[in-house]
Structure formats: C-alpha cells, structure tokens
A protein has these predicted regions:
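Conserved phosphate-coordination/catalytic loops
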Residues: 100, 155-162, 248-251
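Short, flexible loop segments at the rims of nucleotide/cofactor-binding pockets, characterized by
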Residues: 58, 154-158, 181-182
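Short, contiguous clusters of charged residues that form electrostatic/catalytic patches at enzyme active sites
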Residues: 104, 108, 159-166, 255, ...
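Von Willebrand factor type A / integrin I
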Residues: 1-33, 42, 51, 170-174, ...
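Von Willebrand factor
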Residues: 141-176, 188-190, 210
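Short, glycine/charged-enriched secondary-structure capping and boundary segments
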Residues: 72, 95-97, 137-138, 193-195, ...
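Short, electropositive alpha-helical surface patch
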Residues: 132-147, 259, 287
C-alpha cells in the first residue's frame, strides 16, 4: 500500500474511532476497566476483618506480629492489544475483511485508553511474536499503532494463541488489561496459558468472524482454501448434508471456545464482520459493570 493511501486510511479510521471513543465509550470504558488494577502501597499491622491473604509473612516474622499489605487502585491502567495477524484474518465475504474490523476495534479501544489517561501497547502475533510495541501515551503513539494495524506484514500465516499469551505473561511485569483480537481459529489448545495469563492480568477476548465460516451458502461446487496452511479442496455446498456438517463443526468449535473462556474466567464477546461492533463492545462493557 502506498504511503499516501496508508495516511488517508489512518486519518479515516482516526476520525471514526476517536469519535466513537469520545462520544460513546468513554464512561463505559472507565467503569468497566478502572479499579481492576491494584498497586502495593504499604504494610500496616493486622486489624480484625483484614483478609488473611494480604498478610506479609516476611514482615510478620521480622516483628513477631501480623502485618498486612495495603493496596490502592492504580490511577492509570496499562492496556495491551494482542492482535492476531495470521492468514485467516485476511478473509471476508460480507462488507469487510476480518482484519479491517479488528483494526477498527483496536483503534477504538486505543483511543478509549488514551482518553482515560492509560498507556496502550500492542503485541502482533501469528504462530510467533511478530512485533511488540511497548505501552505509551499520546496521539502520535496511537497513530503509529493504527498505521501498523493497517499495513503490518507478518512473517508467518499460522496462529498460536498459547504462545502469545505466554509472551504476555513473561514480558508484562505489572498487571495490565489485555484485549485479544482474533477469530480464534487455532488448532492448538490455549486454555492453560489463558488461565495463567488471566491470574496475572485482566484478559478480555474479542472474536471477529465471517458469517460464511459459520454457515455455508448453497451455491454448488465451491473451492475452499485454508488461508494459514494453503490447503485447498472442493466441496459441494448444494448438499444439505455438507452444509449441516459444516455448521455442526462451527457450533462445536464455538462451544469449546466458550468453555475455555468460562473456565479461564475471561470475559468475551463475538462479533461478525457484517454486524455493528459498537453494540458488541457496549454489551461487553456492560457485562463487566
């Protein structure tokens, strides 16, 4: 993509997503995510009613009487966008590519973060960590992020969400809120990695998918290609049995995904590329209030 074309697209996305974050999401974002980051403040003597899980055993042993750690709400959050840049995101049959919607959602979240004086960073991942943008503040930083979202070229086309979660757990030393934006079409289980990551951080999953992945149209013979492996095959979509089997595969996959999120205690939302992601995000924020 030409530089002038990229800049026009950056500007167009900035105007749309900054308007959304200013006019719609500002209050909801604040109440949904503020107060979840707690920072150590001091130690004091144990008082009746204190949570015994907050006892500082080192200080208690030193003074031979119980002391507890005191925490206070962090004034600013660190927000990480974990963006899937694998080949399957370059797919779309209705309205836009999955990648385009992911870009807009990520930009909206970024502007919402900056509006609330939070830092924002990005992890681009495929089946490897493609790029890490450390969290910072400021409009210039966000415009750089949007430009990368639009024009980033990954080295790999495959997906490994487990690896991305493990990287987040290791690279982010302090607690952060991390949004995973993906279609979650990954053959490898990431349940354990998600559970571990969500103990340290606040993980939020946003699934973007195309309706034709969920339901095949009856258009006769169709050649389909796996965007990540390159494998191609012909299927007869005029067959009700073929369409039914494909739909059952999708339902089972979604059930497994929902179970993973539930067991990992991760909030999630799914949005189709032909739907309004604003409503989906508002539902997500409301769920967390």
């Amino acid at each position: 993509m030409e530089t002038s074309e990229i800049l026009k697209k950056v500007r167009r996305i900035e105007i749309k997503t900054r308007g959304l974050s200013n006019n719609i999401f500002a209050g909801q974002y604040h109440s949904a995510f503020k107060g979840r980051g707690m920072a150590f403040s001091e130690v004091r003597e144990y008082q009746f009613g204190d949570d015994i899980r907050d006892i500082d055993w080192n200080v208690t042993a030193r003074f031979n009487k119980p002391f507890v750690k005191v925490f206070e709400e962090e004034r600013e959050l660190t927000v990480m966008l974990m963006v899937d840049v694998s080949g399957s995101l370059e797919f779309g049959t209705v309205k836009q590519l999955k990648k385009d919607m992911v870009t807009e959602i990520a930009a909206t979240l970024a502007f919402s973060a900056i509006q609330n004086n939070d830092k924002i960073g990005v992890i681009f991942f495929s089946d490897r960590i493609e790029k890490f943008i450390p969290p910072k503040k400021g409009r210039k930083h966000i415009l750089y992020i949007i430009r990368e979202l639009i024009d980033f070229k990954p080295e790999s086309r495959r997906t490994n969400i487990r690896l991305a979660l493990e990287y987040l757990t290791n690279v982010m030393k302090r607690r952060c809120t991390a949004f995973i934006l993906s279609d979650f079409i990954d053959q490898e289980s990431f349940k354990n990695a998600m559970t571990i990551a969500n103990r340290k951080h606040d993980i939020v999953a946003i699934q973007v998918y195309d309706r034709r992945v969920a339901e095949l149209p009856a258009v006769g013979l169709m050649r389909i290609k796996d965007a990540e492996t390159g494998h191609e095959q012909w299927i007869d979509t005029s067959s009700a049995g073929v369409r039914k089997a494909h739909h059952e595969w999708w339902v089972n996959k979604q059930t497994e995904l929902d179970e993973t999120f539930t067991k990992s205690n991760v909030d999630s939302v799914s949005v189709r590329t032909d739907q309004d992601y604003v409503k989906a995000l508002l539902n997500l924020f409301a769920k967390r209030n």
